[in-house]
């Protein structure tokens, strides 16, 4: 498991009965987590002293309760700064476990010693975008939701990176990649965080298990002749890390060589000393002589 254990402004305090108790800066949140299938005692007093709790509804969805929070606040991870905003469907705009990938990206880009062009697909609020930009890469950030792209710009500004070479694209990721192929554009590093399920603007249905292989096949066509890394993230429970590795070996490593690793992402739980699993990642890297 790749553990995101370098946070100072965020921590999972405890987990029990389908929920996790978290500290985001100075605020305590309780949010649902489908991985938490254990019913351990909620001995930590902060379970009863939270600033906000997201409660699921029996009819679907849910809402924030006891919301004693500002509309937004900031948390830092190393040199990166993020705007935290409690949203519908429990989210805050940051996936803290991805810090394990941010560290990998920043280290790999800095070690490369050359200009690196990064394509970040399904880029959300831009955690990977600002990590790569902070390391000196130029980044193309693509997400179909305009609000998420605007939020990513806020994070970039908060991190003091607004002058870095970042191209902001609001578009369907597959359509954008198809256009880049026609233009002859290439990238040295590709990151993707595709959803488990979604619908496009014209009613197209996206199911990760059905669409991931052809999508990765498409995206691999914009890799440069000297690629640095290729990363796939997944929060789909049924998609094992080894499946993503097999796919990446077939579509990327077969052409470029290099090495592929896949594993779960996780966050340390303070009160138990255990690790909470938080999705999976596959990383391909081109080993340089």
Positions of predicted regions on the chain:
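Conserved SAM-binding loop of SAM-dependent methyltransferases across substrates and taxa
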Residues: 125-139
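Short beta->alpha hinge that forms the Motif I/post-I loop of the SAM-binding pocket
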Residues: 123, 143-147, 211
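S-adenosyl-L-methionine
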Residues: 145-191
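S-adenosylmethionine
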Residues: 173-253
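Conserved alpha-helix/loop element of class I SAM-dependent methyltransferases that forms part
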Residues: 96-114
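Non-catalytic substrate-recognition/targeting regions of SAM-dependent transferases
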Residues: 7-22, 29-96, 103
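C-terminal catalytic and target-recognition region of SAM-dependent MTase-like enzymes
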Residues: 227-289
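Conserved class I S-adenosyl-L-methionine
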Residues: 114-124
């Amino acid at each position: 498991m790749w553990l995101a254990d370098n946070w100072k402004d965020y921590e999972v305090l405890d987990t029990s009965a389908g929920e996790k108790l978290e500290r985001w800066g100075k605020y305590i949140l309780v949010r649902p987590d489908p991985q938490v299938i254990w019913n351990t005692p909620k001995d930590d007093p902060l379970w009863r002293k939270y600033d906000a709790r997201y409660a699921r509804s029996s009819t679907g969805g849910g809402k924030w309760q006891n919301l004693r929070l500002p509309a937004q606040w900031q948390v830092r991870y190393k040199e990166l700064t993020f705007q935290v905003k409690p949203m519908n469907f429990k989210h805050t705009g940051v996936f803290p476990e991805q810090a394990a990938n941010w560290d990998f990206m920043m280290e790999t880009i800095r070690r490369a010693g050359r200009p690196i062009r990064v394509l970040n697909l399904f880029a959300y609020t831009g955690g990977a975008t600002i990590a790569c930009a902070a390391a000196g890469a130029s980044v193309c950030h693509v997400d179909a939701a305009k609000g998420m792209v605007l939020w990513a710009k806020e994070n970039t500004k908060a991190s003091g990176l607004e002058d870095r070479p970042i191209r902001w694209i609001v578009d369907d990721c597959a359509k954008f990649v198809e256009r880049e192929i026609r233009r002859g554009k290439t990238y040295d590093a590709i990151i993707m965080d595709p959803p488990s399920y979604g619908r496009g603007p014209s009613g197209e249905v996206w199911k990760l298990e059905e669409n991931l292989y052809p999508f990765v096949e498409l995206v691999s066509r914009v890799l440069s002749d000297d690629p640095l890394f290729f990363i796939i993230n997944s929060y789909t429970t049924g998609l094992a890390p080894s499946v993503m590795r097999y796919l990446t070996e077939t579509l990327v490593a077969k052409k470029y060589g290099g090495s592929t690793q896949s594993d779960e992402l996780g966050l340390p739980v303070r009160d138990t000393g255990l690790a909470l699993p938080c999705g999976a990642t596959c990383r391909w890297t081109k080993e340089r002589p």
